[in-house]
């Protein structure tokens, strides 16, 4: 029921509401964990009106679906995150946003839980109600390989775009550029 209780229209409305409040307060806004095309459209409309709205998405929204939440046994609990993964029909919309600059940054939403731990996904009470399953999935170690293999290798995005949304734009958005996010004389040489 996790995906059913968090449908696309709710995310779209929350995106619209956050943008409206940022507009009233006259402040920039970063919308994180965008999982669908309707929320993406809200972001594009706000930008067309001249608002400073930035956007982020994560690996689970280009690789997982709501069906993963229904895997046999209790394995679906491993994929509980919010917003939940959507249908695979949303993937092209997210990829289009990645390719064409709607998404400024690509992050991990890293929030892992040990499956069998007392506070983990299969903790006491979790099987009685999906509401008791901790929200979050690991991602820091898979963010770059997933975007590279699914994006660059499959020619959905360029290598330059990969660098922008995984490094350069993060540094710009958080005021660290050009010391971070660039390979130039005088910048930090923290490349792996």
Residue ranges and their predicted role:
Residues 3-26, 78-79, 105-106, 112-192:
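His/Asp/Glu-enriched, well-ordered alpha-helical/loop segment
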